[in-house]
């Protein structure tokens, strides 16, 4: 994939998915078939509260004035998978998710990152906790000494999910999907019911869980003031439309049995 400049529509503090730099070949090579990952997950981990409300498990992040949406989304994915694997709550490093992905991408400066860079962090390099590499108030990719040797967490990732059946099967197994797409006014709704990919800047968020209506919960990184609680919903039809987008990438993640402590239920 040619590396042109990241999208001109990228706005620090709101967006940050540098889709012009995306490497689809690496996403395919590092990812596994979704059905295989699902089987391994079901065979390895016990079932905790798989109907948990996302806001009861996660802390909604605010990326502030950085184009770090991908790193914020990846950190949420790790928190979800950690909960599913152990029944416990933990916060993972947004800085590691963003700055290490940028390093892999070859992007310098606060210009966003790619899902392929994030996938490399999740499956190859490893992630650390937020307490090991705290999120700074302004762009600062320098890794602190406290993060040295702390990248002990990894995940399994799928190849890009390209059809609605695969997406729903993943979500209905209570597993998260990191998404990257063009974000525009059709996305700034309580329920996204008429998504269009024709314009907008690159943004990355997390799909996790479905409401009784069948709508999919989307976890954003613009703080709790956005939409009143930091999350909103997408209809299945809007997700279908998103999958047709030129710049859309959906990656399913699951716990890696070799990278988490022995499962322990919440007491």
Residue ranges and their predicted role:
Residues 1-67, 71-90, 110-120, 124-130, ...:
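Structured alpha-helical subdomains that flank or immediately precede key functional sites
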Residues 2-4, 8, 75-79, 103-267:
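Predominantly the structural core of cysteine protease catalytic domains
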Residues 89-105:
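Acidic helix-start/capping segments at beta-turn-to-alpha-helix junctions
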């Amino acid at each position: 994939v040619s590396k042109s400049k990241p999208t001109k529509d990228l706005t620090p503090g709101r967006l940050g998915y540098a889709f012009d730099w995306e490497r689809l070949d690496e996403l395919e090579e590092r990812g596994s078939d979704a059905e295989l990952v699902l089987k391994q997950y079901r065979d390895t981990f016990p079932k905790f509260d798989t109907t948990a409300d996302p806001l009861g498990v996660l802390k909604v992040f605010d990326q502030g004035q950085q184009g770090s949406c991908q790193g914020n989304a990846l950190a949420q994915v790790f928190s979800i998978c950690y909960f599913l694997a152990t029944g416990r709550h933990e916060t993972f490093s947004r800085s590691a998710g963003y700055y290490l992905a940028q390093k892999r991408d070859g992007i310098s400066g606060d210009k966003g990152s790619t899902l392929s860079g994030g996938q490399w962090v999740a499956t190859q390099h490893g992630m650390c906790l937020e307490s090991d590499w705290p999120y700074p108030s302004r762009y600062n990719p320098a890794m602190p000494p406290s993060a040295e040797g702390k990248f002990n967490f990894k995940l399994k990732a799928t190849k890009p999910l390209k059809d609605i059946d695969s997406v729903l099967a993943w979500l209905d197994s209570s597993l998260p999907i990191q998404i990257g797409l063009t974000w525009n006014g059709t996305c700034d709704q309580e329920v996204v019911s008429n998504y269009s990919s024709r314009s907008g800047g690159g943004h990355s968020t997390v799909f996790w869980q479905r409401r009784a209506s069948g709508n999919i919960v989307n976890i954003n990184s613009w703080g709790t003031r956005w939409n009143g609680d930091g999350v909103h919903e997408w209809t299945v039809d809007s997700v279908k439309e998103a999958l047709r987008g030129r710049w859309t990438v959906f990656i399913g993640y699951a716990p890696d049995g070799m990278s988490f402590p022995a499962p322990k239920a919440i007491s």
